[in-house]
Amino acid sequence: MQMSFNTKKCHVLHLGHRNTHYDYSLPKMSNIKKTSSSISYTYMFHQLEKVHDEKDLGVTVDDNLNFKLHISQKISKANSMLFLIKNYFQFLDAEMFSLLYKSLVRPHLEYASPVWSPTTKEDIKRIESVQRRATKLVPQLSQLSYTERLVALKLPTLEYRRTRQDLILLFNYIQQDIILDPSTNCKVCRNNSSMLTPITSGTRGHPFRFAIKRHTTVRNRFFTSRVLPIWNRLSTATVTANSLNCFKSGLRKDPSLPSPYIFTHDPASIISRRR
């Protein structure tokens, strides 16, 4: 006998502007009759509830696929932890703050970030504001600028860490799915259904560049649409690393990436770059 679904925990999440929003039902066992020779079952159909968002493996997915609800929830949890740290620790030095922040606050803002990484300036600033406010808890650093506080604490911006995590995930995928044919020096996909389309023409850039497909506003938030423009700008030495550790080391030195301590959406950093 197979385990049946708990219909009360099953929901329907409709995606897409043109979705027809059909009703869906699951069979639910309602009656069992046992005899000396057999067992008979009676089923009834349970209509599944329609929802606008659903949490799966710790990530809240909404019907617009913009993950604003998930981002708001994680910011709220991170702020709650900051409030506890501020109340329970009257004095924080740099070492103690780094330990508490990295273990209790930052994980809320980074868990599964390649899935929900924000694409709007508003959401990027909202997430970064948590770390901006947190770094002021160290009394000796509270009067410094945000960039100076990050340098003193050796904390990269959350924006930089999300970009780095995206690139690491893409590197791992490429190592498993894309190979370089030594006879033709062309890229070949091991899997015909690969989500990446190698660029076979042109001499500029590294040999593992991929085509950025046309996309709608919703698709613009997808992983490949977000990370491929950054990946294609990386240096050849970085993308041809023979191990993950070498790739991570290359990211720290790659000239195409911004400084890990400068928040690119900070007005002060924008002015300094223009000068």
What are these regions (language model features)?
Residues 56-64, 78, 105, 109-116, ...:
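Short, conserved catalytic/metal-binding micro-motifs enriched in Asp/Glu and His
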Residues 2-14, 123-195:
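Short, charged alpha-helical motifs in flexible N/C-terminal segments and linkers
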Residues 40-42, 242, 248-275:
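C-terminal helix/juxtamembrane-tail motif
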Residues 4-52:
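Short, conserved micro-motifs composed of acidic
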Residues 3, 83, 87-90, 110, ...:
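Charged/polar positions within long, soluble alpha-helices
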Residues 65-74, 88-99, 117-127, 155-161, ...:
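Conserved, non-catalytic sequence blocks in retroelement Pol enzymes and Pol-derived host proteins
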Residues 45-115:
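Basic, alpha-helical interaction scaffolds
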Residues 45, 180-226:
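Amphipathic alpha-helical
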